[in-house]
Amino acid sequence: LADSGHNLRCMICDRKDAYAFERARKLGIKTYYVSYYKRDREEAEKDICSILEAENIQLVVLAGFMRLLTPYLVDRFRNRIMNIHPALLPKHPGTHGIPDSYNSEDRELGITIHYVDYGMDSGPVIVQKSFERDFTESIEEIEEKIHKLEHIHYPETIKKVLDELDSQHQRG
C-alpha cells in the first residue's frame, strides 16, 4: 500500500505481545492495544470505535483478529470492515480454515476476502482466489500456497476498495 496513495493510519491489536506492534513501529505506524481481558466484547469495541473515529478511519482491515465483532462495531463501519480467510467460503469458516480445507476432498483451495457482518466468515465476498489442489502435497505446502495468495491479493484488494471509497466520497 506504500505506493497506493493511501495511508495506514494506525494498527489496533488485542494481543499485547503481538509481533505486529514491532512491525508497525518500525514503519512509523501509530499503535494501540485494546484489551478484551475480563471485559465484554462490546465494551472493548467501544474503545476500538473511539480510536477508529478519532483517527478518521475509512476502512478497517482485519488480519489475524480471531474474534467475532459485535453489532456495535459492525454497524458503525458497515461494508467498511474487511477480513481475509484462508479457505474458499462458504466452505470451512472459522479458525481452522487451512486444516479443514486440507482434510477435505476439495479439488480447489484458496482464500476469500470479504466484508464483515454479524456472523463468522459470512459477510459479502469481495474476491476469492484459488489453485487446483495436488493431493500429494503436505499441509505445510498447502499453507505456503495459501499464504502466498493472501500476501499478493489482500493488499491489491484493499487498494481497490479504498479507491472505490474515495470515488464514492468524491461523487457525493
Tell me what each language-model feature is.
Residues S4-H6, D14, A63-H169:
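Donor/substrate-binding cores of folate-linked one-carbon enzymes
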Residues R9, Q58, N79:
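Conserved acidic residues
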Residues C13-R15, Y37, R41, E45, ...:
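N-terminal glycine-rich "phosphate-gripper" loop used for MgATP/nucleotide binding
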